[in-house]
Amino acid sequence: MYKLVLVRHGESKWNKENLFTGWTDVKLSEKGVSEACEGGRILKEEGYSFDIAFSSMLVRANDTLNIILCELGQSYIDVEKSWRLNERHYGALQGLNKAETAEKYGEDKVLIWRRSYNVPPMPLDESDKRHPIHDSRYKNIPKSELPSTECLKDTVARVIPYWTDKIAKAILEGKRVIVAAHGNSLRALVKYLDNMSEEDILKLNIPTGIPLVYELDKNLKPVKHYYLGDEDKIKAAMESVANQGKKIDR
């Protein structure tokens, strides 16, 4: 039996402001730092330790991982970072307020942009400075692979090869693995692991900073999964994620 721990980064400053973030590199809020500390504390209390960690190229996930490993006294372990674990690219929506966008275009349309499986938001033009081709951290990635926008289907298409080539390989080698990433890159992975339908993945809400444990059989098929922590806090955190795209009250 293998165990895999997944953690969505703690609340970022743009999460706090209810903005579409995507590939924009935004730091953790004070609450996000506290969430990461709490996640690390819970993992330590439950006796978890790790041999290798995987994360994205974005600071909010990297800092969450660093805080957790510091809480565990394991800052020394190997960390592999990849753009394939980045958040879903939200195209021209990046930087816009989710609730105000819902007021302008309607909640249903924003829900489709946020959570549909195969409908991407409006793309960024390559001349836009927000486009990843202008970010030096991706200079070694072929331009043709860098997205202008993504739907969840696109995110799945880049996450799963990394799972197969890197993460699953490490697990099968007997390494204890933690992955610190993002709401949609983790949803992509969960969809694959649990063989979820496109309809069911629409309803999945992964809370920030709360460790999600998968117990896997010898073929890396899930036996069960569960969050670590207080059940009421977990439920409230999931509801908070679900409410982000709703219209603001006047």
UniProtKB/Swiss-Prot annotation:
Protein name: 2,3-bisphosphoglycerate-dependent phosphoglycerate mutase
Active site: 9, 87
Keywords for this protein: Gluconeogenesis, Glycolysis, Isomerase
Molecular function terms from GO: phosphoglycerate mutase activity
Presence of the UniProt keyword Transcription regulation in the record: no
GO biological process: gluconeogenesis; glycolytic process
Span of the signal peptide: none
The keyword rRNA-binding is annotated on this UniProt entry: no
Residue sites binding substrate per the record: 8-15, 21-22, 60, 87-90, 98, 114-115, 183-184
Residue numbers marked as site, Transition state stabilizer: 182
Family affiliation: Belongs to the phosphoglycerate mutase family. BPG-dependent PGAM subfamily.
Catalysed reaction, written as an equation: (2R)-2-phosphoglycerate = (2R)-3-phosphoglycerate
Coiled coil: none
NCBIfam families: pgm_1 (TIGR01258), PRK14115.1 (NF010713)
